[in-house]
Amino acid sequence: MNALTPLSARLERSDGHALVTLARSRGAVRLRDLAQRGSAKAFLPRVEGDVPEVVFLNTSGGLTGGDRLSYRLELGAGCRATATTQTAERAYAAGAGAARVEVLHEVGRDGWLDWLPQETILFEGAALERETQISLAPGAGCLMVESVVLGRAAMGETLSRLAFRDRRSILRAGKPVLVEPLALDDRALAAAGGAAMLGGARALATLAMVGPGAEDALGPARAALGEAGVEAAASAFDGKLVLRLLAADGWPLRRQVARLLTVLRGRALPRVWQV
């Protein structure tokens, strides 16, 4: 009798990189360069008005252990643009190692970037390390949001295993003006009901505005709060506006975030964000 020896299979990992460069030319903001490979894609849909939109997309359908993903946007001096993601990002159970995501955006002098990725949904056993950095030149500003959902409440999912590290930073002339690290693991999930942790929330978001007019936006931002099921706090200081939000489910959080972004931007969200 011959014994069959199982063959070990090496799972293919996704690896993607997308870079978009915009510059002002002939009185308008235009595409200067577009480079993409692997699972990362970027496109510029037609929009009304003179503020272009850049939409990033991970064609692999989600992230798991060993995956690599990079999004980069470079805005020239005087450029204003909005960047977002095609859909929510999903991080699935990791067999070995963590998925790594790098988001690096640069905003030239007197430019402005709205970085509005859709939410990240973390599934049981996910392992994800993400670094988001926005570098501002003198006179530049940005509005950014990051939303995280712990499982799908509608499916009755409750997470107990997770390895999530997320670091968001905004720099001006190379110096940090806002740094926000977040780490969630098994121990944090076990204590998530405590007031010092998530207070039982399963969805969380941070929204930050840095640049001219940021502190003046505190009043309109607070007036836009009030979505049922969402707890929120807002503060403004040193040229920054920061809001933090918690909810028991991703949908009320998404509605609240969408309302805030619409108020702060003074115009509709990108079409892919339709709520």
Swiss-Prot record:
Required for maturation of urease via the functional incorporation of the urease nickel metallocenter. UreD, UreF and UreG form a complex that acts as a GTP-hydrolysis-dependent molecular chaperone, activating the urease apoprotein by helping to assemble the nickel containing metallocenter of UreC. The UreE protein probably delivers the nickel. GO terms for cellular component: cytoplasm. This is Urease accessory protein UreD. It is found in: Cytoplasm. Coiled coil: none annotated. The keyword Cytoplasm applies. InterPro entries: UreD (IPR002669). Disulfide bonds: none annotated. The gene is ureD. One of its GO terms (molecular function) is nickel cation binding. It comes from Cereibacter sphaeroides (strain ATCC 17029 / ATH 2.4.9) (Rhodobacter sphaeroides). Belongs to the UreD family. Keywords: Chaperone, Cytoplasm, Nickel insertion.
